Amino acid sequence: MPTRDELWTKVQKLLQKNLSKPSYETWIRPAEFFDFKDGCLTLLAPNSFSSDWLRKNYSQTIEEIASETFGHEVKVHIKVKEEFSSNKSNKKKNFSNVEANSIATSENSDVKSKQTPIKKFLPSLNLRYVFNRFVVGPNSRMAHAAAMAVAEAPGREFNPLFICGGVGLGKTHLMQSIGHYRLEIDPGAKVAYVSTETFTNDLIVAIRKDGMQAFRNRYREADLILVDDIQFIEGKEYTQEEFFHTFNALHEAGRQIVLTSDRPPSQIPRLQERLISRFSMGLIADIQAPDLETRMAILQKKAEHERMRLPRDLIQFIAGRFTSNIRELEGAFTRAVAFASITGLPMTVESVAPMLDPTGQGVEVKPKQVLEKVAEVFGVTEEEMRSPSRRRPVSQARQVGMYLMRHGTDLSLPRIGESFGGKDHTTVMYAIEQVEKKLSSEPQLASQVQKVKDLLQIDSRKRR
């Protein structure tokens, strides 16, 4: 009669046949057999992320195959290995192939860390941007699935992975989740995360300091490169030239490339045809604005992470009023929580609604009014905002004006650009993104923007 260990080995072989190789190698092989008692099969996952993923995506398959193999119903419990570290010497039943694989992985990681200076590949990843905090909806299902596939098996199916979509829809979140995932699986992985602006600045510094070889080594030695906002490479001929060769070097070496943009490659103006071709050779995954159910799920998940309980009607109220993007939605949530905390009022629709929509309805304003009020609050003139001046006060006022026109009017990006002396629509888009990024970290700017909104009675949800 086969032992439990032999039966588990048989289960593993059947799982290997039923699952794709990347899925088996990434999720099943690292899991260790811990115990089998009273019809319960206990497995140990290497970390909490793997444990959650196994439980959510593979527990049913494991239960079905194990039940068939053991000859009776089997329930699977998946635990985190670290939780059992104190008694693993007494209870844990390991297999030599798994143990050897763990040792080999550890040794390889040590070799990698010795060969490559750590500081070269320390990605500035946001700790919040991980897969288990990303809410998947119809708007993002394909992009999420592609990101997971790339994270599990980099350099194979979708290379490059090109994620595109509007501002604040989760492109950066998905991209950085891939980086976190790879580092979770392989701490020695060389992950490079940069914005296109950083890549360009690094290139300029390298040219000035005669450091092109070091620059090329830094980017071309990466196992995984994540480049955010690649649309800003438009019109930068030398940057495009260098990125073309970097792309080729990485792709030919089988390294994974992930790019994000606010539009598909073919719609990026002044982008070299050869780059359009290369950016399109993998998979282009689009993210759309989330629907009502997804927006509600996003708010619910955020509330859970903040350890707060929000009434369902309040969640539905906020989700129904902030429809453009996730960043705007989460901003409304933060304001509602802060308002309730400061005032001591309960978190209800009645108490929060006036703060989120003080006028009761979105007020349409004219571009001229925006210019007037921004000039008044920021201490510049309307003429200066329409001029090419790059003085910081003027530049900041101009960006805020573009941001508020987008939120308070129905003007398209090109029409907003016309209101500021014929600025290009990409300049307007960049200005909007910059203001949105700064609002959470620069209280003075946030106060000035709110003051203009109050003067104009702009409903913050008035954005098409």
Curated annotation (Swiss-Prot):
Keyword check for ATP-binding: yes
Keyword ATP-binding: yes
Molecular-function GO terms, alphabetical: ATP binding; ATP hydrolysis activity; DNA replication origin binding; lipid binding
GO biological process terms, semicolon-separated: DNA replication initiation; regulation of DNA replication
InterPro entries: AAA+_ATPase, Chromosome_initiator_DnaA, Chromosome_initiator_DnaA-like, Chromosome_initiator_DnaA_CS, DnaA_C, DnaA_dom, DnaA_N_dom, DnaA_N_sf
SUPFAM superfamilies the record matches: P-loop containing nucleoside triphosphate hydrolases, TrpR-like
Keywords: ATP-binding, Cytoplasm, DNA replication, DNA-binding, Lipid-binding, Nucleotide-binding
Record-linked CDD domains: AAA, Bac_DnaA_C
Cell location: Cytoplasm
Region (Domain I, interacts with DnaA modulators): 1-84
Cellular compartments per GO CC: cytoplasm; plasma membrane
Residues bound to ATP: G168, G170, K171, T172
Stretch list, region Domain III, AAA+ region: 124-340
Region annotated Domain IV, binds dsDNA, chain positions: 341-464
SMART domains noted in UniProt: AAA (SM00382), Bac_DnaA_C (SM00760)
Domain II: annotated segments: 84-123
Top-level taxon of origin: Bacteria
UniProt-listed NCBIfam families: DnaA (TIGR00362)
Family: Belongs to the DnaA family.
HAMAP family the record matches: DnaA_bact (MF_00377)
PANTHER family listed in its UniProt record: CHROMOSOMAL REPLICATION INITIATOR PROTEIN DNAA (PTHR30050:SF2)
Oligomer status and interactors: Oligomerizes as a right-handed, spiral filament on DNA at oriC.
Record's function text: Plays an essential role in the initiation and regulation of chromosomal replication. ATP-DnaA binds to the origin of replication (oriC) to initiate formation of the DNA replication initiation complex once per cell cycle. Binds the DnaA box (a 9 base pair repeat at the origin) and separates the double-stranded (ds)DNA. Forms a right-handed helical filament on oriC DNA; dsDNA binds to the exterior of the filament while single-stranded (ss)DNA is stabiized in the filament's interior.
Free-text comment on this protein's domains from its UniProt entry: Domain I is involved in oligomerization and binding regulators, domain II is flexibile and of varying length in different bacteria, domain III forms the AAA+ region, while domain IV binds dsDNA.
This protein's name: Chromosomal replication initiator protein DnaA
Organism encoding this protein: Prochlorococcus marinus (strain NATL1A)
